[in-house]
Design a protein with these regions (language model features):
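N-terminal membrane-anchoring/stem segments of glycan-assembly enzymes
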Residues: 1-39, 172-174, 181, 335
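Long helical/loop segments within the catalytic core of UDP-sugar-dependent glycosyltransferases
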Residues: 21-27, 100-119, 142, 146-204, ...
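Membrane-embedded multi-pass helical conduit in multi-pass membrane proteins
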Residues: 35-37, 271-350
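Cell-envelope/extracellular polymer assembly enzymes that use nucleotide-activated donors
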Residues: 41-44, 73
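Short, acidic, metal-binding catalytic loop of nucleotide-sugar glycosyltransferases
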Residues: 61-71
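A conserved acidic beta->alpha catalytic loop
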Residues: 78-87, 101, 133
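Acidic donor-binding/catalytic loop of UDP-sugar-dependent glycosyltransferases
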Residues: 84, 131-146
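Catalytic donor/gating beta->alpha subdomain of glycosyltransferases that bind UDP-sugars
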Residues: 147-150, 154-178, 200-203, 208-270, ...
């Protein structure tokens, strides 16, 4: 039988852990908005795409209208799509690389597609970005300018997230709150939605070929880069691009199963704070059960629920739906279920189905 009072007490941790998550997020430097005058290097934008015909019809027009004075090429890598991904890419006049042969043994699909794109690309800088990422007109130029003028080896950005439904918005907010509660000072994650790196750094480090069998190739690549001494900070790029992560609730659950279980591996001791924050956000549901069955006095419920809601409020505001913070326990519950499912699937070796593949 659950210890209802202990659960209610755990819920009081959601507020300080939520504050910690917000502090950690705000500590990420925001990419400067100015574009200084200098000679722009050549740039290759690489988009790995598997069954992305619909997303490409949004992202490619956004890239067609970006401001970039330097030499620019856009490369779509069609990763064995079953839809019209390659035809859509070609209709926009961008370079399209079709992967026709089976993925070599020891490789996962996305790192293979990214690496094949890098081998073909000609730019001095490589930008790996996803097909669900819509870019603002000057965003990429700002990123290049900052990385070049500050002598960085590259940079990665956390972007504005937009959801297709209030359910996915709620769940993604809870997932980010948990992630940043356990965001340690030595965190070496990169965000695969926007990874900008110098060409020579990519190939000297081995790039995605060095993390070829990783389901979370961006996180693994970030750790590799840090271990090898490269300077590739993660920054905030709220006004650089917008990401539409999941089209359906099923896709969201599978995506979080993949991300949740995989991210835990890379967070080290900080994962305890992530797990504790998710547990604290969920605990008002246990408190509710305790009140309904007469195990707790009713004042516990508004106290625990209010703390969880206030904890998620900054994330709900950023996603444009502040009222969803009132449903914080339900969002965190989905995050927990998805993460546990992903972890069990990984332990059993069955994997999580993602874009038609087990990862």
């Amino acid at each position: 039988m659950p210890n209802y009072k202990r659960s209610a007490l755990i819920s009081t941790l959601s507020l300080p852990l939520g504050l910690l998550a917000e502090i950690n997020f705000r500590r990420l430097a925001r990419l400067p908005a100015t574009i200084p005058g200098f000679e722009f290097p050549s740039l290759s934008i690489i988009i790995p795409a598997r069954d992305e015909m619909h997303n490409l019809q949004v992202v490619l027009p956004s890239l067609a209208h970006i401001y970039y004075p330097g030499k620019l090429e856009i490369l779509v890598v069609d990763d064995h799509s079953s839809d019209e991904t390659a035809h859509i890419a070609e209709s926009f006049g961008v370079q399209t690389l079709r992967l026709r042969h089976d993925i070599p043994p020891g490789w996962k699909g996305k790192p293979y597609a990214c690496h094949r794109g890098a081998l073909v690309a000609k730019g001095d800088w490589l930008l790996f970005t996803d097909a669900d990422t819509v870019h603002t007109r000057e965003g990429i130029a700002k990123a290049i300018c900052y990385a070049q003028t500050t002598n960085l080896d590259g940079l990665s950005l956390f972007l504005e997230q937009q959801s297709s439904s209030w359910i996915s918005s709620l769940v993604i907010d809870a997932a980010f709150a948990g992630l940043f509660a356990g965001w340690g000072t030595a965190n070496a994650m990169l965000n695969g939605q926007f990874i900008l790196v110098r060409r020579e750094v990519y190939f000297d480090s081995g790039g995605f070929a060095s993390v070829r069998n990783e389901a979370l190739e961006d996180v693994a690549l970030g750790n590799l880069m840090v271990q090898r001494g490269y300077l590739i900070p993660v920054m905030r790029g709220d006004d650089i691009a917008v990401v539409h992560m999941y089209a359906t609730c099923k896709q969201m659950f599978n995506g979080l199963s993949r991300l949740g279980a995989g991210t835990l591996r890379w967070q080290g001791m900080w994962v305890s704070l992530t797990a504790l924050h998710i547990a604290a956000l969920i605990s008002p549901l246990v408190t509710l059960i305790g009140v309904l069955f007469g195990r707790l006095r009713w004042p516990w419920l508004p106290v625990s629920w209010s703390m969880a809601s206030l904890s998620l409020l900054p994330w709900s505001r950023r996603s444009g739906a502040a009222k969803l913070a009132l449903l914080a326990p339900f969002g965190a519950c989905v995050v927990l279920l998805a993460s546990v499912y992903g972890l069990i699937s990984r332990i059993l070796g069955t994997g999580v189905l993602w874009k038609g593949r087990k990862v």
